[in-house]
UniProtKB/Swiss-Prot annotation:
Substrate binds at T137, G138, K177. It catalyses: a phosphate monoester + H2O = an alcohol + phosphate. It comes from Citrobacter rodentium (strain ICC168) (Citrobacter freundii biotype 4280). Its main location: periplasm. The active site is at D69 (nucleophile), D71 (proton donor). Its cofactor is Mg(2+). It holds the Pfam family Acid_phosphat_B. Dephosphorylates several organic phosphate monoesters. Also has a phosphotransferase activity catalyzing the transfer of low-energy phosphate groups from organic phosphate monoesters to free hydroxyl groups of various organic compounds. The keyword Hydrolase applies. This is Class B acid phosphatase.
Length: 237
């Protein structure tokens, strides 16, 4: 009888262990929560457009003035800003107020900036159309600058149509780009930041969002499409 009891106990223990192992195997892991079709299909209500669609929308329209922001719009320039922060203010953003940083950034550090592919396509489009292209940046003005030459070289802009970069600067409480967009009669403005889109909206012109790369040093990332503006697909690079 004792042997029968031990056998039954062993069988029960084995069943319990098997059931527990089976239950553990079938339970979702916190590291692998999985997903479902509804989650995969979920999309933000954003007005996505392609470069081809932008080009089509301009068919039949005469040449016009168009504007581009620079950092995170036409250039992935985080390497220079990363270097500047480490050199001048590792624990804060004070380097952005340091004229010495801007002298470096505007006079050589863009050699480490990567031209964005979406910018190549857009600039080529507007050159084909005969549009006047202006670069309007929030960077601080410096006594000399090589940014204009870098952009002309990177995007194959002929010297005859290359306009010098406009350094609007960053003025607290102001959107410093508005006056320049107005002064140059810009009809389309491309930018990655909320300020870029807000400047265009202030003047009633077409503001088109270019996505800021997720590894940009400029954080937090903006909410593309938050103003109902057009957002270019695959424009993070």
């Amino acid at each position: 009888m004792r042997k029968v009891s031990l056998a039954l106990s062993a069988a029960c223990l084995l069943f319990t262990l098997n059931y527990t192992a089976s239950a553990l195997a079938s339970s979702p892991s916190p590291l692998n929560p999985g997903t479902n079709v509804a989650k995969l299909a979920e999309q933000a209500p954003v007005h996505w457009v392609s470069v081809a669609q932008i080009e089509k929308s301009l068919t039949g329209r005469p040449p016009m003035a168009v504007g581009f922001d620079i950092d995170d719009t036409v250039l992935f320039s985080s390497p220079g800003f990363w270097r500047g922060k480490k050199m001048y203010s590792p624990d804060s953003e004070e380097y952005l107020k340091n004229p010495a940083f801007w002298e470096k950034m505007n006079n050589g550090w863009d050699e480490f900036s990567i031209p964005k592919e979406v910018a190549r396509q857009l600039i080529a489009l507007h050159l084909r159309r005969g549009d006047s292209i202006f670069f309007v940046t929030g960077r601080s003005q410096t006594s000399n600058e090589r940014v204009s030459k870098t952009l002309a070289d990177d995007f194959l802009i002929p010297a005859t149509v290359m306009n010098p970069v406009i350094f609007a600067g960053d003025k607290p409480g102001q959107n410093s780009k508005i006056q320049w967009l107005q002064a140059k009669n810009i009809r389309i403005f491309y930018g990655d930041s909320d300020n870029d889109i807000a400047a265009a909206r202030e003047l009633g012109i077409r503001g088109i969002r270019i996505l800021r790369a997720s590894n940009s040093t400029y954080k937090p990332l903006p909410q593309a499409g938050a103003f109902g503006e057009e957002v270019i697909v695959n424009s993070e690079y």
